């Protein structure tokens, strides 16, 4: 009701769906070359990403390699709450609603508590919080770990420690590139 319609087709829903299926099937067969080229490009991209992730298998490991490894251990129901740690392109998720990012309104420290919320919603589902060291600190980790432990929640917390609060640093440098923050860390 709240979306504008370009074309309304009144009629019997079952008959309309059969007709649409026939029409769309004909169009799909006409576009097979395009689908094939898109699949080829997608496969090549995935291969490039896998190579890039593998290159980060060292000490310290890259975010790409860590994301690939986390993706490998996730079962069909696991969910990840990413806060500046696990880049999605390097993950092979098993279905929808498996990967969450912080809201655009901000929220350093969002990942760990959000993962706890997912655990509370379904105690049989592994929740993974993948956060940077600054995000971890802003999450009030003592309280989060106490809640997780006292309620026996199935959570895995991965903290990527780069020794700097990069999100804060990037924000400060974006506003004040020559300010005091540019001389720190």
Spell out what each predicted region is.
Residues 4, 9-16, 20, 34, ...:
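General structural feature for long, well-ordered alpha-helical segments within catalytic domains
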Residues 40-122:
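Active-site diphosphate/adenylate-binding microenvironment
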Residues 21-29, 75:
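Non-catalytic alpha-helical coupling and interface elements of nucleotide-dependent molecular machines
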Residues 28, 78, 125-126:
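Secondary-structure boundary/capping signal
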Residues 2, 8-10, 17-21, 89-185:
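Thiamine diphosphate
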Residues 5, 54-58, 132:
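Conserved short-loop catalytic and cofactor-binding motifs
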Residues 27-42:
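Flexible, glycine/charged-enriched surface loops at secondary-structure junctions
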């Amino acid at each position: 009701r709240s979306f504008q319609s370009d074309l309304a087709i009144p009629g019997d829903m079952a008959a309309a769906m059969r007709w649409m299926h026939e029409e769309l099937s004909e169009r799909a067969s006409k576009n097979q070359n395009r689908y094939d080229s898109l699949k080829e490009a997608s496969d090549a991209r995935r291969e490039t990403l896998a190579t890039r992730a593998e290159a980060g298998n060292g000490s310290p490991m890259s975010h790409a390699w860590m994301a690939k490894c986390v993706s490998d251990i996730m079962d069909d129901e696991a969910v990840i709450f990413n806060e500046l740690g696990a880049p999605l392109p390097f993950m092979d998720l098993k279905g929808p609603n498996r990967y969450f990012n912080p809201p655009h309104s901000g929220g350093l420290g969002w990942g760990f508590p959000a993962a706890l919320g997912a655990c509370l919603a379904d105690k049989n589902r592994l929740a993974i919080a993948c956060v940077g060291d600054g995000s971890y600190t802003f999450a009030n980790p003592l309280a989060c770990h106490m809640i997780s432990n006292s309620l026996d929640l199935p959570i895995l917390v991965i903290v990527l420690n780069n020794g700097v609060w990069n999100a804060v640093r990037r924000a400060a440098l974006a506003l004040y590139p020559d300010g005091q923050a540019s001389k720190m860390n």
